[in-house]
Amino acid sequence: MAFIYRCQIELHDSLYFATREIGRLYETEPVIHNYALCYALGLVDSEIYSTTVSEEHSYRYFCPEQVPKYEPHLTALNPQGIYVTPGRSISHSSTLNTWKYANNNYHVEMEKTQKNIPSFGRTKEISPESKFEFFIISQKSLKLAKWIRLGKWMSKAAVEIVEQKELKRSPSETNFIFPYLLNPLDVMFSHLVISYDVVNMPPVSLIQNVKMLGRYYEFDKLKIPACMAYRFRAD
């Protein structure tokens, strides 16, 4: 048996992260990566969810650097049977903003820079009141935060569990189509992926309208792939 949560996120601030860069335009795709959701929901390196990692890879408020280390951080969720799918847009709109970065130093030595830091540009952001939907699959009951922060600007968003069910996975493998977003690395080792559409975005491109062979959970009329886990290598 697994607990399946259908969750929705409503933005209360503009959401920005650079899905793609077109010249000086930095565009935010109306998609929330499942890696980002794990961090935003507080599932990573958490005593509450029993996903703590070694001190070397610590990802808490007081740590040497708050840099995501996806493999040690996310694979810690696998023993607890916690998996989050990417978030798809239910309704959204976008806004364009122009920004400029200025250096106000009185004295500047003209040295070759080691980092490519843009000085101006435009951002295409997801507007407030936009809504996203995702699923959480867990082997035990979870209590989620009602408010989270997302994106480069740490935008405020409300989380709501719209529906939850306790389900058994299908007894046998069968062909089915999952129309929403999936992380291919997390599903390809437990299912035979036959066809899909690609959504290009870092750090791992996502897929949707996926036809596959494998086991699933039947949530209302939707078949959600079972046995998904965070994978980063073919061991």
Report each predicted region and the residues it spans:
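Short acidic, gly/pro-rich beta-turn/loop elements at beta-sheet edges
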Residues: 19, 51, 144-146
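Beta-strand elements of well-folded, non-transmembrane domains
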Residues: 11-15, 138-140
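Extended, compositionally biased
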Residues: 29-142
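Short amphipathic
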Residues: 3-13
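Short N-terminal binding/cap micro-motifs at the start of the first secondary-structure element
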Residues: 15-21
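A short, structural micro-pattern
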Residues: 1-3, 128
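Basic polyanion-binding and macromolecular-assembly surfaces
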Residues: 129-235
